[in-house]
């Protein structure tokens, strides 16, 4: 059965180490689209952080979709219509804010419009995230966050500090929230059962596609959920070694246009 939907992660997958889309990847995506294959960007980034990529890849046509915030938001790219929109409650935010202070890690909350931190000394990885996704940073106290629609929170810090903090996260937190590590310095916390996998499953059902007709390409732990729900999971050569254990295929690295290799080898 032919593959009709490809979900593609961005960082470490779609773009190379210079955060660029290679000509080979661009051409392969255009050829897949011309063949009637849905190419869906699936990322932890907010929508503002993928707008330029959607334009560059010409994925703004009627019937094109994008998955952002690690699955909390699914939209039609032509008009912004929301298919899925999940958010955290204010109580969830307070829960996470309190835990971050207890663990001694920086935290920020992300809405559809900006990045909010209650840390007066804004962490460098919050600044990094702001630059990466083209969103402004706002300092707000926890009390000032009550009226914000928070899509996800992130614990962000030096890798060794974050890893030590992760070991101390209470078990019940994993029962109440969806928690994924998207980079060595990022831990993402979302509403329970929200991840790239749930988003891709919903989208495939909406499009009437079977599991065998779906493919996902990723490199990091926050891609695990979507790799687990598709019939054709592909992991990048530069991907997490643990993730490769669940892959059907291993493609070339992101610096070798691995997405293009996957599309041309197993789709077209």
Regions found by a protein language model. Give the residues of each.
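Mg2+-dependent phosphoryl-transfer enzymes with acidic/Ser/Thr/Gly-rich catalytic loops
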Residues: 1-5, 22, 188-268
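Asp-based phosphoryl-transfer active-site loop
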Residues: 4-18
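Active-site phosphate-binding/coordination module
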Residues: 23-123
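Hydrophobic packing residues within well-ordered alpha-helices of enzyme cores
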Residues: 25, 50-54, 165, 169, ...
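Short active-site oxyanion
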Residues: 36-40, 64, 152, 212-213, ...
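Short, structured coil segments at secondary-structure junctions
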Residues: 62, 70, 173-175, 229-230, ...
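Conserved acidic, metal-coordinating active-site core of Asp-based
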Residues: 99, 103-217, 224, 238
């Amino acid at each position: 059965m032919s593959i009709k939907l490809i979900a593609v992660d961005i960082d470490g997958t779609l773009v190379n180490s210079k955060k660029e889309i290679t000509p080979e990847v661009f051409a392969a995506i255009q050829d897949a689209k011309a063949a009637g294959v849905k190419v869906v960007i699936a990322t932890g980034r907010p929508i503002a952080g993928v707008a330029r990529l959607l334009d560059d890849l010409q994925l703004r046509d009627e019937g094109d979709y994008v998955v952002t915030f690690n699955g909390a938001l699914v939209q039609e790219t032509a008009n912004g219509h929301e298919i899925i929109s999940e958010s955290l409650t204010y109580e969830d935010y307070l829960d996470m804010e309190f835990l971050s202070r207890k663990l001694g890690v920086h935290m920020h909350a992300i809405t559809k419009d900006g990045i909010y931190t209650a840390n007066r000394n804004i962490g460098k990885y919050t600044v990094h995230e702001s630059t990466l996704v083209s969103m402004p940073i706002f300092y707000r106290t926890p009390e000032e966050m009550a009226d914000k629609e928070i899509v996800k929170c992130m614990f962000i810090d030096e890798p060794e500090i974050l890893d030590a903090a992760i070991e101390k996260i209470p078990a019940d937190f994993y029962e109440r929230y969806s928690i994924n590590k998207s980079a060595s310095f990022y831990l993402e916390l979302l509403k329970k059962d929200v991840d790239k996998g749930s988003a891709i499953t919903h989208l495939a059902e909406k499009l009437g596609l079977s599991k065998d007709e779906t493919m996902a390409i990723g490199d990091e732990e926050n891609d695990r959920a979507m790799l687990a729900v598709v019939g054709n999971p592909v992991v990048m050569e530069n991907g997490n070694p643990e993730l490769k254990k669940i892959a059907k295929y291993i493609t070339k690295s992101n610096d070798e246009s691995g997405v293009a290799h996957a599309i041309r080898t197993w789709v077209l």
